[in-house]
Design a protein with these regions (language model features):
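Phosphate-coordinating catalytic segments in nucleotide- and nucleic-acid-processing enzymes
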Residues: 40-208, 219
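Switch/communication elements of ASCE P-loop NTPase nucleotide-binding domains
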Residues: 1-68, 184-287
Length: 287
């Protein structure tokens, strides 16, 4: 196993830090390690090959995970250099350090979740059917969740915000999102009057659905004043959407005071925010 040593420093005064590198250089693995360390996820930490991972925060707090043998499932967990950490201290740390992970492609079905509402389903059979459908296409569950939440003022405000952000990215599709009869639907633009039917979210293209789910996660899942790990958000998106993506992400982050670490290999994403990128170059390649 080749050794890769990375020292990644986030920009302290910036909302977004971009990890930019080729495929296979460990971007996704690094994000998953950060997530696992923050939660002390024993299963995940046991599955990764590493010697030491250390997270250092602006307030001086320090978390480290260390293995004597990289492929060993056993590891030592340190908080501020202290090895013998009480379970209560770890739980306190978790509550004060929230991480939301948004992974690309197949991970989306696993990571996109929706609050359970007792009045969302009329019977157990419908719940079972929808659980199966959500595994295949979470946009269907999102559609039903939105229907349930539109009557709650705070949630409706977030849904309106989701609608507005998506509409900023949708002009090239000749459609926009509207709330009609307590449904969030895709509606043809006015100049296309011959197309008078609205579209449910689940019949939109994979890229359109991906965009909606991604911004849903940022608005509804990410806790205020927390860290968001965003992995390869460019997947399935047109180049123009890739170029505009981070400006939309920044609007949400400013409102919720989030810090985002983005892993990408898309030049379209990096070109507008070149000054925020941190190249992932292994120590052995540095001169």
């Amino acid at each position: 196993m080749e050794r890769n040593d990375f020292d990644i420093e986030c920009f302290p005064n910036e909302i977004i830090t971009i990890l930019y590198a080729f495929n296979g250089t460990g971007k996704t693995t690094l994000l998953k390690l950060i997530d696992a360390v923050s939660k002390n996820d024993a299963i995940a930490l046991g599955s990764f090959l590493f010697k030491r991972v250390e997270l250092i925060f602006d307030n001086g707090k320090n978390i480290a995970v260390e293995k004597n043998i990289p492929n060993d499932k056993e590891y030592n967990y340190y908080i501020d250099g202290k090895l013998s950490v009480e379970p209560e201290e770890i739980e306190k740390l978790k509550k004060g350090f929230k991480v939301t992970t948004i992974f690309a492609n197949k991970d989306y079905n696993r990571n996109t979740s929706f609050p359970k509402k007792t009045n969302l389903y009329e019977n157990k059979e419908e719940l079972a059917d929808d659980t199966f459908i959500a595994t295949v296409n979470p946009i269907i569950t999102l559609r039903r969740y939105i229907l349930n939440m539109l009557n709650e003022p705070e949630q409706r405000t977030k849904i309106e915000q989701l609608k507005n952000i998506i509409n900023e990215n949708f002009p090239m599709t000749f459609k926009h999102l509207e709330i009609e009869n307590n449904h969030l639907l895709a509606v043809p633009d006015p100049e296309y009057k011959e197309i008078d039917s609205s579209l449910e979210l689940d019949v939109l293209s994979s890229g359109e659905q991906k965009l909606i789910l991604m911004f849903y996660d940022l608005l509804f899942k990410a806790n205020s004043n927390s860290i968001v790990l965003l992995d390869e958000p460019e997947s399935s998106l047109h180049l123009d959407w890739q170029r505009n993506l981070l400006s939309s992400v920044m609007k949400i982050c400013e409102d919720k005071e989030l810090q985002v670490i983005v892993a990408t290999h898309s030049p379209a994403i990096v070109e507008e925010y070149y000054c925020l990128q941190v190249p992932m170059i292994s120590a052995r390649y540095k001169k």
